[in-house]
Amino acid sequence: MSSQSFHNSPSLRVILKQRKKKRLLIVLFCCLIIAIATSLITYALRNTVSFFRMPSEVTKEDILMGRPLRLGGFVEKGTVEYVGDRGVIFFVTDNVKHEKVIFSGAIPDLFREGQGVVVEGYFDKQGFFIGTRILAKHDETYMSRETADRLNKHHRVEK
C-alpha cells in the first residue's frame, strides 16, 4: 500500500477528526474552568475590595444600608472640630458635595484642613459618616492618575 493511499484512507481521516474534536473539547473545558474560577474569585472578593467614593458618588443606598465603605476627598477648610482627647468632627468634600464625618481614634499627623483624606467607616441612621480609620494623604503622588484626575476635576490638589 502506498503512503498516499494510506493518508487518504477514510479510517485515518476519522481518527484525525476525533483527535481534533478531543483537543477542542479539552480547550473548551479549560476555558470553562478558568471562567468559573474567575467568577468565584470575583464573587468572593466583591465585598473585601473597597475603593473609596467621593461625597458626590455616595448613593442613598450606601447611607441606608450602613455597609462599610471608604469616603475620600479633602478635609473641608473651617470644618475641623476636635472633641475630647481623640475625637474629631469634620467634613469631607469634593467641592460638589460634602459629608459630615464623626471620628474617634488615633488621628494621623498628616491630617489637616485642605488635605486629601480617605476615611474608612459607615453611615449611621442619621446619615452621618462614622469613621473607624483615617488615612491622611500627603499629596497626589500616592494616588493613581485616575483618582487624582477625579479629584482635580472638582478641586485643585494642594501640595
UniProtKB/Swiss-Prot annotation:
It is found in: Cell inner membrane. It holds the Pfam family CcmE. It is a single-pass type II membrane protein. InterPro entries: CcmE, CcmE-like_sf, NA-bd_OB-fold. The keyword Nucleus does not apply. Keywords: Cell inner membrane, Cell membrane, Cytochrome c-type biogenesis, Heme, Iron, Membrane, Metal-binding, Signal-anchor, Transmembrane, Transmembrane helix. GO terms for molecular function: heme binding; metal ion binding. GO terms for cellular component: plasma membrane. It comes from the Bacteria. The keyword Ribosomal protein does not apply. Residues 1-23 are cytoplasmic. Heme binds at H138, Y142. Residues 45-159 are periplasmic. The chain crosses the membrane at residues 24-44. GO terms for biological process: cytochrome complex assembly. Its main location: membrane. Belongs to the CcmE/CycJ family. Heme chaperone required for the biogenesis of c-type cytochromes. Transiently binds heme delivered by CcmC and transfers the heme to apo-cytochromes in a process facilitated by CcmF and CcmH. This is Cytochrome c-type biogenesis protein CcmE. It comes from Bartonella henselae (strain ATCC 49882 / DSM 28221 / CCUG 30454 / Houston 1) (Rochalimaea henselae). The lineage of its organism: Bacteria, Pseudomonadati, Pseudomonadota, Alphaproteobacteria, Hyphomicrobiales.
